[in-house]
């Protein structure tokens, strides 16, 4: 918060000067001297400004004498007056005028709860006094301020005054402190009341305090400021200002609505709205619309409005539905109301909110469905009818878990009265409260519970520490409504967890207190949530502070993205996330783009349209820009700013993405969630294979509920595509729809260019096609709208139409038989056959290391390719006629490269119309090379006459991928290959001859290992740090197992080998033609309807919490998050992934995650982040103490009792990678370096080290984090330690042990002042010789069993090495190929026999 709120210090304007100069005088002359000096200081102001004001007719003026008299004779006065009576603008001016009349010194400060109110009121008062704003009257809110040495009336926000008093610890500089809107009881106001009361009784006894409230109950404030007298305590006087109503507003209650009511009783024990109540409110709207306006003396030219107060957005949607349903049911058009239904809530863009002020059309009535935003923030003047459900939704924080819950409760009477005040401004009106009168009068609370009793207390406790007037509990006990001691204790624990407080006070552990750290002081200065402040400080440590400030500001303001609940806005969110899977990075990218465009275009209509088109809320972005400016200014004043110069830390763009995710994991620890699939990864892969019929789950979704015996699928392909493309026909070419008659499923595979990700596009990290995410989002959004309904033909009509369209034919015995396609010359296919282990190939084209093309270099294939090339280029080819029609899948001759005369075979893939030329451009695929190109139809040549035979020769190149590798998560955080890695791979392989060892062939893609000159390209890319290991998919392992066994059989049986070779030469395949032209049956034939279920994906997952208090709770992600659709983006990888949430809300028993980020696909990332950023950790070993199996992190335990200090937030992460001594050493070095940057000297409040030293430390931070992230870790099977959450089970590993001190040595200099104390050494034991012998023998038996065809026992067998249950022989064989098993074999130094 701002360190000062008053005007700048000046010898002509500050009362402190009077105190100083008069201090040496005799006590009896002091008051006289002060009065003389004050008169001398104020005299120039009295001459420069007008201190008399024209009288107005505001209600407050009737009370002016009483107000001034009470203020003069009392230290504290409570002024109660309804909104609009004039108290905010007039009372401070009364005091100015009185000071002028009495020639006395004055310095008045007035607080407002909101920035906009402080500025607008200051501007209005300056206008009334006819002075320039910033002179006699000024304001100060955040970084915005207008005041000077003349200012005697200063409007500020509550927080500004609070921070000023905390810093100065006196109010003596002010003659009057006016606290306005005290009835709102926000946290800052309640704490300010504590400070004001404390200072009044100590060093500021002469300052007058005025509390102004709009509530009907000011007694509480009066009692709080009791003054001790000889006869007892005297409460502060209360002055009530009455405001006469200009228009009559009648009040009605639920029990007054007899004509509308069904036999229905409200359940007052369960606040909420039932379906009957929605219907009653809808009927009430119709009744109001029929009431004659003349009864109320209306003067408006249009129908006045109705406002309905509802507790939340969900209720607004339901109320809208009830109104629409009722209106549709009214048959008589004359009786049917013409309603303009408008929504009003805080998540709407500012432009949409202002729409409620527009006039309705002729004979139309506006019905506003609003949350409590219309109580005070927004006033619509033309309201006649108020319908109030008397409900509110308040945010309540469970301090034990730190999760917030939006709870629906009955509103208070004061809330309801304020809502009623929306009517009667321009005309008479009516208020309908949908509760019984008796309940309203006798059971509803007078006012809403103060925020301090239900909201987070972190900032309050930090301010209490800065106040230095006692422990946080002792200070907060002085509050008007003291928080529960348990809530204070839990808040202190939370502050210790985030590093704002130490666990000790002057070296001694204290459960209810702790020394404030430098990190905590910075948190107290920033107007942000403490975790966001920590994010910024970690950004400072990791040299990404600029980005951290932007992300933090975006998280703190209202959502900068328009939340329109559509696939379009979801796609835009993906676009802004740029493949990061992070809401935080989406904020950074969106703001950066907006800021850049704003600087170029300014605040223009084009800028407005661009923001809407890109699903951005312009008002929120402007607020975000202001907050960024304010945060940077406060950081600068604290000496924290990005370092410039040659020695600064520099991250490239891709490294920065990873580092931003690292600091997000640090700032929002312990909000860690593990995406999980039911039954584990291996089971999920097997199910994906089964559910999709062997299709790729990364680009395929499916629908169920399609009866293939009744319907002919290809007739409805266009409708299926329409559903998934939301009517965008340009996307139809990129979808392939298939029908499975055995499962009654429809499969849709998304084609397209997901490989080229150099340009920013809408995609997610990992291998899953973005359209799969969009399809699942479509299902979740459209569940209510039945988007998967398709129209079908009657069977007889369908058979006739499909037969005439050439889609197949009908057989009485078999039903519909689809058209089949013959694969000619299949024996000439270049795809490696099952018996071929290695192929000598040339690399003809490279997209990236997981997609390139190979052409076999054996003599036969070379001859075939040469013959094709010769035939196409030895003669003049004929162009197509100008009126030729082309079709997808058609083969033509096309130039291999632009402006060249060399032709090759090409297949037409997709087309688009070129607007500028009016021609058609096709994407063509060169089947003998592997590359694609875009060209116009005029470039095509015919394959006619003798060249027609070329159409029957299979492609001479096949697609391949490097086995068991994927992009490095460090340099490719989006999971896509970088331009640099692709360029290097091309340099290494393009045009060169390699030996390709075939691992598997899935579909038409071969997974291979490329070798040349004893260099294995797969390993080489890992060595160059472009790639990391990747598990092969289940279907790839399945094919690999089949190939290995078949090749072994062939090797052992010469007759079988000859038979296999011979059959390969005779192969002639047919398959169902799935490249049919889309057909669109006539509308009049589509007379039936079928509702499908879907689309579904077998990759859909849920997340699981990791902290102790939440492990059993279901988890969902907020609907506008980029991760609202959570899929297993790398299904072949078996290690656990990590999802970090910026915030967690609780809905019933369910956790809802906000501002989520998918962490990099680095094995063990969650455990590593926990070890880096946790307060302390314990490394739990297995029973033999040979390996670490669990990382237990949290605040630790009480050394005297062994009990956990904060058990609800203890986190136990099971390790699936090997953690060794190098890891702990590097993590400790990083923790120590972070501590050094944040460390303050003894008795100091600023960092101990200077800028030059801190810069060196930041360079060390970069070195350590890169070393930690790049460290390759072997896989481990998941095993749980006994008593995972028990801190007492292994006291040898706890902080402070002798072994710990020995290991830490000289590095333990921070001792109990460390925010990141060093972790303990591993001290692991070697695996015993007997155990090694047993495991090796077990492995030998597994391999031996894999060679057989025996059936496994009923419940399967367990791999003792990996702790995996294997139920079938294929599962066993595939498991033996897994990286987990191979790593475990390597760890016990077992050499497996040659694979079968």
From Swiss-Prot:
Coiled-coil features, chain-numbered ranges: none
Q: Mostly located where?
A: cytoplasm
Q: Name one Pfam family in it.
A: HA2_C
Record's superkingdom? Eukaryota
Task: Give the matching SUPFAM superfamilies.
Answer: P-loop containing nucleoside triphosphate hydrolases, Tudor/PWWP/MBT
> What Enzyme Commission number(s) does the record list for this chain?
3.6.4.13
Q: Which InterPro entries match?
A: DEAD/DEAH_box_helicase_dom (IPR011545), Helicase-assoc_dom (IPR007502), Helicase_ATP-bd (IPR014001), Helicase_C-like (IPR001650), P-loop_NTPase (IPR027417), SNase_OB-fold_sf (IPR035437), Tudor (IPR002999), Znf_C2H2_type (IPR013087)
Which residue numbers does the motif DEAH box cover?
Answer: 180-183
Q: Which reaction does it catalyse?
A: ATP + H2O = ADP + phosphate + H(+)
Which SMART domains does the record match to this protein? DEXDc, HA2, HELICc
What GO annotations for molecular function exist for this entry? ATP binding; ATP hydrolysis activity; RNA binding; RNA helicase activity
- Give UniProt keywords alphabetically: ATP-binding, Cytoplasm, Developmental protein, Differentiation, Helicase, Hydrolase, Meiosis, Nucleotide-binding, RNA-mediated gene silencing, Spermatogenesis
Role summary: Probable ATP-binding RNA helicase which plays a central role during gametogenesis by repressing transposable elements and preventing their mobilization, which is essential for the germline integrity. Acts via the piRNA metabolic process, which mediates the repression of transposable elements during meiosis by forming complexes composed of piRNAs and Piwi proteins and govern the methylation and subsequent repression of transposons.
**Stated name of the protein:** Probable ATP-dependent RNA helicase spindle-E
Organism from which the protein derives:
Culex quinquefasciatus (Southern house mosquito)
Q: Which gene encodes it?
A: spn-E
């Amino acid at each position: 918060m701002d360190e000062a709120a008053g005007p700048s210090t000046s010898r002509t304007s500050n009362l402190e000067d009077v105190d100083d100069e008069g201090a040496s005088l005799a006590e009896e002359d002091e008051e006289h001297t002060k009065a003389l000096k004050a008169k001398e200081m104020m005299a120039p102001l009295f001459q420069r400004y007008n201190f008399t004001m024209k009288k107005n007719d505001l209600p407050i003026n009737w009370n002016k004498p009483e107000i001034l008299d009470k203020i003069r004779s009392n230290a504290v006065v409570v002024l109660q007056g309804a909104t609009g009576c004039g108290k905010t603008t007039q009372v401070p001016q009364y005091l100015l005028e009185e000071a002028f009349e009495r020639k006395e010194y004055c310095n008045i400060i007035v607080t407002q709860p909101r920035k906009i109110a402080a500025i607008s009121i200051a501007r209005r008062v300056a206008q009334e006094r006819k002075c320039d704003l910033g002179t006699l009257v000024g304001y100060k809110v955040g970084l915005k301020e207008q005041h000077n040495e003349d200012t005697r009336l200063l409007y500020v926000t509550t927080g500004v005054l609070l921070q000023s008093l905390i810093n100065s610890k006196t109010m003596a500089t002010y003659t009057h402190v006016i606290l306005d809107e005290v009835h709102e009881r926000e946290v800052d106001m309640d704490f300010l009341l504590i400070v004001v009361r404390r200072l009044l009784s100590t060093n500021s006894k002469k300052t007058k305090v005025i509390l102004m409230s709009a509530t009907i109950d000011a007694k509480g404030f009066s009692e709080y400021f009791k003054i001790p007298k000889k006869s007892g305590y005297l409460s502060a006087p209360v002055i009530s200002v009455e405001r006469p109503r200009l228009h009559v507003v009648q009040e009605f209650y639920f029990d007054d609505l007899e004509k509308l009511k069904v036999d229905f009783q409200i359940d007052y024990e369960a606040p909420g709205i039932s379906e009957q109540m929605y219907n009653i409110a809808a009927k009430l709207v119709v009744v109001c619309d029929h009431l004659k306006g003349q009864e109320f003396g209306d003067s408006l030219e249009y129908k006045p409005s109705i406002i309905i107060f509802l507790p939340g957005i969900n209720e607004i949607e339901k109320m809208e539905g009830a109104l629409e349903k009722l209106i549709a049911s009214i048959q008589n058009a004359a009786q049917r109301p013409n309603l303009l239904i408008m929504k009003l809530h805080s998540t709407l863009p500012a432009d949409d909110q202002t729409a409620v002020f527009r006039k309705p059309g002729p004979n139309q009535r506006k019905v506003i469905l609003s949350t409590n935003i219309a109580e005070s923030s927004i006033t619509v003047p033309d309201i006649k009818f108020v319908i109030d459900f008397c409900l509110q939704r308040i945010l309540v924080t469970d301090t034990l878990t730190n999760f917030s819950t939006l709870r629906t409760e009955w509103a208070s009477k004061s809330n309801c009265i304020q809502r009623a005040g929306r009517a009667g401004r321009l005309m008479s009106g009516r208020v309908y409260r949908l509760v019984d009168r008796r309940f309203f009068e006798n059971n509803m609370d007078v006012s809403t519970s103060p925020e301090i009793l239900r909201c987070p207390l972190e900032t309050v406790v930090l301010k209490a520490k800065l106040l230095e007037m006692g422990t946080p509990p002792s200070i907060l006990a002085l509050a008007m409504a003291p928080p529960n001691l348990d809530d204070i204790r839990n808040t202190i624990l939370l502050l210790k967890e985030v590093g704002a407080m130490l666990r000790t006070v002057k070296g001694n552990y204290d459960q209810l207190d702790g020394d404030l750290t430098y990190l905590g002081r910075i948190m107290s200065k920033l107007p942000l949530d403490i975790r966001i402040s920590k994010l910024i400080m970690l950004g400072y440590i990791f040299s990404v502070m600029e980005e951290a400030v932007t992300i933090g500001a975006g998280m703190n303001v209202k959502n900068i993205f328009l939340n329109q609940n559509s696939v379009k806005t979801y796609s835009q969110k993906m676009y802004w996330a740029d493949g990061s899977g992070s809401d935080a990075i989406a904020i950074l990218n969106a703001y950066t783009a907006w800021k850049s465009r704003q600087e170029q275009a300014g605040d223009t209509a084009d800028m407005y349209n661009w923001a809407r088109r890109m699903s951005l809320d312009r008002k929120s972005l402007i607020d975000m820009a202001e907050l960024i400016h304010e945060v940077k200014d406060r950081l600068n004043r604290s000496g924290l700013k990005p370092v410039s110069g040659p020695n600064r830390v520099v991250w490239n763009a891709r490294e920065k993405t990873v580092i931003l995710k690292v600091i997000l994991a640090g700032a929002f620890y312990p909000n860690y969630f593990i995406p999980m699939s039911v039954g584990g990864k291996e089971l999920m892969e097997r199910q994906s294979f089964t559910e999709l019929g062997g299709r790729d789950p990364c680009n395929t979704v499916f629908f169920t509920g399609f009866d293939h015996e009744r319907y002919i699928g290809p007739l409805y392909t266009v409708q299926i595509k329409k559903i998934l493309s939301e009517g965008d026909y340009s996307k139809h070419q990129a979808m392939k729809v298939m029908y499975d008659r055995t499962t009654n499923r429809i499969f849709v595979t998304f084609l397209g260019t997901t490989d080229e990700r150099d340009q920013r596009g809408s995609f997610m990290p990992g291998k899953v096609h973005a359209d799969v995410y969009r399809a699942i989002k479509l299902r979740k959004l459209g569940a209510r709208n039945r988007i998967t309904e398709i129209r079908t033909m009657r069977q007889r009509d369908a058979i006739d139409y499909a037969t005439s369209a050439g889609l197949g034919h009908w057989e009485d015995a078999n039903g519909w038989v689809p058209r089949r396609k013959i694969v000619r010359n299949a024996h000439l296919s270049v795809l490696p056959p099952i018996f071929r282990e290695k192929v000598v190939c040339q690399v003809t084209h490279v997209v990236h290391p997981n997609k390139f093309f190979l052409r076999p270099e054996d003599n036969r294939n070379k001859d075939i390719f040469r013959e094709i090339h010769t035939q196409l280029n030895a003669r003049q080819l004929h162009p197509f006629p100008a009126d030729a029609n082309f079709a997808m899948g058609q083969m033509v001759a096309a130039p291999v490269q632009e402006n060249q005369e060399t032709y090759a075979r090409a297949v037409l893939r997709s087309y688009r119309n070129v607007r500028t030329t009016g021609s058609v451009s096709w994407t063509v695929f060169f089947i003998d090379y592997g590359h694609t190109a875009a060209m116009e139809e005029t470039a095509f040549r015919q394959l006619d006459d003798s060249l027609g035979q070329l159409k029957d020769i299979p492609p001479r190149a096949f697609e391949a991928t490097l086995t068991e590798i994927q992009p490095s998560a460090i340099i490719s955080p989006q999971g896509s290959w970088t331009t640099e890695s692709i360029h290097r791979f091309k340099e290494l392989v393009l045009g060169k001859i390699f030996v390709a060892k075939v691992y598997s062939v899935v579909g038409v893609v071969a997974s291979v290992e490329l070798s040349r000159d004893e260099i294995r390209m797969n390993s080489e890319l890992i060595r160059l740090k472009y790639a990391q290991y990747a598990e092969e998919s289940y279907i790839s392992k399945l094919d690999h197992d089949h190939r290995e066994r078949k090749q072994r059989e062939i090797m052992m049986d010469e007759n079988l080998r000859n038979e296999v070779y011979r059959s390969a030469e005779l192969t002639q395949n047919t398959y169902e033609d799935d490249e049919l032209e889309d057909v669109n049956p006539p509308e009049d034939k589509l007379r039936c309807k079928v509702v499908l279920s879907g689309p579904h994906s077998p990759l859909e997952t849920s997340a699981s919490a990791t902290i102790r208090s939440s492990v059993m709770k279901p988890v969902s992600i907020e609907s506008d998050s980029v991760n609202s659709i959570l899929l297993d983006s790398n299904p072949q990888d078996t290690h656990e992934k990590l999802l970090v949430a910026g915030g967690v809300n609780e809905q019933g028993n369910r956790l809802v995650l906000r501002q989520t980020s998918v962490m990099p696909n680095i094995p063990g990332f969650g455990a590593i982040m926990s070890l880096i950023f946790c307060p302390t950790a314990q490394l739990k070993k297995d029973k033999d103490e040979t390996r670490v199996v669990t990382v237990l992190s949290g605040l630790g335990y009480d050394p005297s009792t062994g009990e956990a200090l904060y058990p609800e937030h203890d986190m136990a992460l099971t390790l699936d990678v090997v953690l060794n001594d190098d890891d702990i050493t590097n993590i400790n070095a990083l923790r120590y370096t972070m501590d050094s940057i944040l460390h303050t000297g003894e008795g100091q409040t600023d960092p101990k080290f200077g800028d030059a030293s801190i810069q060196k430390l930041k360079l060390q931070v970069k070195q350590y984090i890169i070393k930690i992230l790049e460290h390759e870790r072997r896989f481990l099977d998941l095993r749980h330690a006994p008593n995972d959450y028990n801190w007492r089970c292994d006291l040898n590993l706890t902080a402070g042990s002798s072994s710990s001190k020995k290991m830490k040595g000289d590095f333990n200099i921070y001792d109990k002042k460390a925010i990141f104390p060093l972790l303990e050494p591993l001290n692991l034991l070697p695996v015993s010789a007997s155990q090694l012998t047993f495991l090796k023998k077990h492995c030998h038996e597994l391999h031996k069993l894999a060679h057989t065809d025996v059936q496994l026992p009923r419940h399967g067998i367990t791999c003792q090495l990996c702790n995996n249950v294997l139920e079938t022989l294929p599962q066993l064989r595939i498991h033996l190929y897994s990286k987990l098993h191979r790593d475990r074999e390597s760890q016990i130094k077992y050499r497996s026999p040659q694979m079968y």
